[in-house]
């Protein structure tokens, strides 16, 4: 028996050291497919109570010792740092290093961390693990490593480019989001990170995803720059049927903005990580959906075939729109998903969840396919996610786009020039764009508008806006039942062509 075990180990070593050996997503997919055929085993917490019961301020005290960054003794521009377990990050994840010839487990050591004022028994932490990791790269300055990627919790990851700060998150997979049965949160249980060469400008990460009803193999190629791009390939296997599968999910926060002003006096005009969902539909239409913080859970679906892209965007970068010196919402990136290949029929879905403060992510967007295979069958998805502050990259170059949506009390100007509220709600939508700016001011621009059964458009008008060299649409809307949401759409056009993307808005229920 011992001889056979030694022989098996020798065979494995030969495979790993063979010059033809190379780790790939297929190696992870074999594990994912095998897991899908077995019953789900929930991860078990190994945390002592002092770490399990700690508050966020205590968890923040546990800092990685930057002088011990992984690969710090190599010439590669990428470095790794790790997150310690604590709070709800209570189960360890395995992290491996992949080289040209081997796969090696990166072992946890408490020596990696400075625990601050957190009192703990050193013997109780020696057998703990990592909760996740972060990637550092000299993205802003050649002589300084800055954090560009964080993978921590469930299948969440955050990414930034040059001059950006963390904002919205991406996820590996979403299951049954906003369904009455409750959402299932898959988690990355193991990672494999390729050791980069000194000249490499991209980093490859593999991940094994697991949850009660799905498993998956993921390959992330991270390409840092002015815009950081993550190339994603996934192979997903269902253990059991799901109500809804969310592919390429994005998670963000919207508290208030001009389309939904703060109910309390606030020196910040806007407070959000993203202010709209942008969609490039399979038929070529561009759609802009401003975000809400509703009083009740709200879901908006956009059915289409073979989407060309979608994303949660932060449109408008002037500091005066946010006035927040601490959180710098003006520097938070937009995230744009570009599918590779044909994704078939399905929906881009937007979920908006009520929140009272900015600490809760209350916005989710994802692609959900109409048809799902039987459990055990492989699903393949390939796409890129671009994290950018470049407005011009995130809308059609020849289309006008919505610069701002403002909501106001509807009114009518009286003969004495005093404005009198008339029981309507007014929406003021500014459109601009490179081609639109070339149009003469007297161009006969009109609005194509529509509203759902719960509302009536009392008046709509379009006028030239010299401040932005664009056009302003003003609509006064009368809502029939305030307990129900009201859907609206609008676009600008001339007699012979459409000039703008489609403004699509849901006025939330008010009760």
From Swiss-Prot:
Its main location: periplasm. Keywords: Periplasm, Signal. It holds the Pfam family MdoG. InterPro entries: Gal_mutarotase_sf_dom, GH-type_carb-bd, Glucan_biosyn_MdoG/MdoD, Glucan_biosyn_MdoG_C, Ig-like_fold, Ig_E-set, MdoG_OpgG. This is Glucans biosynthesis protein G. Pathway: Glycan metabolism; osmoregulated periplasmic glucan (OPG) biosynthesis. Involved in the biosynthesis of osmoregulated periplasmic glucans (OPGs). It is found in: Periplasm. It comes from the Bacteria. The gene is mdoG. The keyword Transcription does not apply. One of its GO terms (molecular function) is catalytic activity. Belongs to the OpgD/OpgG family. SUPFAM superfamilies: E set domains, Galactose mutarotase-like. Residues 1-22 form the signal peptide. One of its GO terms (biological process) is beta-glucan biosynthetic process. One of its GO terms (cellular component) is outer membrane-bounded periplasmic space.
């Amino acid at each position: 028996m011992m001889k056979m075990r030694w022989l098996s180990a020798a065979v494995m070593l030969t495979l790993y050291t063979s010059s033809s050996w190379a780790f790939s997503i297929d190696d992870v997919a074999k594990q994912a497919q095998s897991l899908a055929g077995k019953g789900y085993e929930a991860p078990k917490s190994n945390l002592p109570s002092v770490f399990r019961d700690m508050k966020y301020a205590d968890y923040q005290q546990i800092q990685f010792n930057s002088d011990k960054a992984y690969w710090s003794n190599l010439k590669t521009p990428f470095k790794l740092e790790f997150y310690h377990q604590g709070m709800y990050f209570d189960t360890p994840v395995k992290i491996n290093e992949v080289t040209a010839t081997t796969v090696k487990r990166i072992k946890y050591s408490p020596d990696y961390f400075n625990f601050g004022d957190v009192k703990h028994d050193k013997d109780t932490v020696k057998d703990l693990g990592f909760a996740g990791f972060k990637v550092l790269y000299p993205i802003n300055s050649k002589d300084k490593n800055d954090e560009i990627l964080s993978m921590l919790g469930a299948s969440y990851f955050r990414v930034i480019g040059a001059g950006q700060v963390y904002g919205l998150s991406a996820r590996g997979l979403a299951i049954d989001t906003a369904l009455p049965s409750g959402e299932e949160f898959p988690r990355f249980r193991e990672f494999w990170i390729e050791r980069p060469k000194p000249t490499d400008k991209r980093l490859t990460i593999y991940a094994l995803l697991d949850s009660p009803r799905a498993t998956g193999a993921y390959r992330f190629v991270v390409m840092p720059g002015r815009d950081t791009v993550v190339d994603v390939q996934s192979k997903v296997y269902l253990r059991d049927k799901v109500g809804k599968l969310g592919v390429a999910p994005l998670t963000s926060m919207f508290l208030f903005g001009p389309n939904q002003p703060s109910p309390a006096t606030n020196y910040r005009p806007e407070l959000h990580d993203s202010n709209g969902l942008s969609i490039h539909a399979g038929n070529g239409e561009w759609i802009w959906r401003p975000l809400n913080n509703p009083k009740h859970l709200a879901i908006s679906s956009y059915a289409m075939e073979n989407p060309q892209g979608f994303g949660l965007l932060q449109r408008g970068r002037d500091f005066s729109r946010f006035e927040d010196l601490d959180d710098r919402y003006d520097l938070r990136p937009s995230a744009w998903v570009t599918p590779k290949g044909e994704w078939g029929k399905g929906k881009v879905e937007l979920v908006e969840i009520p929140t009272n403060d900015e600490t809760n992510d209350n916005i989710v967007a994802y692609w959900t396919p109409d048809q799902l295979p039987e459990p055990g069958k492989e699903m393949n998805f390939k796409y890129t996610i671009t994290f950018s502050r470049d407005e011009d990259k995130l809308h059609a170059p020849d289309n006008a786009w919505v610069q701002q949506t403002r909501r106001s009390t509807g009114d009518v100007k009286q003969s004495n020039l005093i404005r009198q509220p008339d029981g309507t709600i007014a929406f003021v939508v500014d459109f601009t764009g490179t081609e639109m700016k070339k149009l003469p001011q007297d161009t006969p621009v009109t609005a194509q508008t529509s509203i759902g059964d719960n509302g009536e458009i009392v008046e709509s008008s379009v006028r030239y806006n010299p401040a932005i060299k664009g056009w302003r649409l003003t609509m006064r809307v009368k809502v029939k039942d305030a307990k129900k949401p009201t859907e609206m759409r609008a676009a600008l056009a001339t007699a012979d062509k459409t000039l703008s993307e489609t403004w699509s808005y849901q006025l939330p229920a008010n009760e």
